[in-house]
Amino acid sequence: MGVQRCQGPILPWSQRPSQGCFRHGEGVRAWLGACEGALQTHPAGREPLPIGALHVGQVAVYHKFVVERLGRVAFGTELTFGSFMAGRAVDTFEGIQLGREENGFGGVCIRTAGDADGFALHKPGQIRLIRVKNKFSAMFFDAFLTFGFHEFVSTLGDKEAVRVPVDRLYGPVLERSASVLFVEESSPL
């Protein structure tokens, strides 16, 4: 799959929110509280956060369930694109790549394989549906992949398009069974 790891802390599986937490929200709120505290420990918000973190952008949808935005923190769920199997991701996720303007896409592409028969292409602020194993997952990406593309995440497709801004990324990100925390920078009301 060709996923590379960045340096950063990993939250043990036993401490990660479960699917039920996503549905009910309380576990997510409690877990995000610790992450928000980690953000506040550094004036620039660059202190490494559990699992993987971006300091710009947000993603907050899993199987049509929208995780509530809490202040300047929004949580990106397990990237499974299917059903959970013993708490692990289904082997359909292959990677992420940037859509290129010359192809008519300006956003983010989530690549899947196996029985998956779709992928998502997003322009900032838009929502698209992905058909995977006859299920639909909605993923919302704001404009966070905007600069610093200098590390490959997947070996798929055009290698010039499969990079992420690792200068703002911590932890193993976008691999099977990985969770990703997308953190918004504070902005005036």
Swiss-Prot record:
Please name one Pfam family that this protein belongs to: DUF5441
- What keywords appear on the UniProt entry? Early protein
Domain of life, source organism:
Viruses
Put simply, this protein is called Uncharacterized 20.6 kDa early protein
Source species, please? Human adenovirus B serotype 7
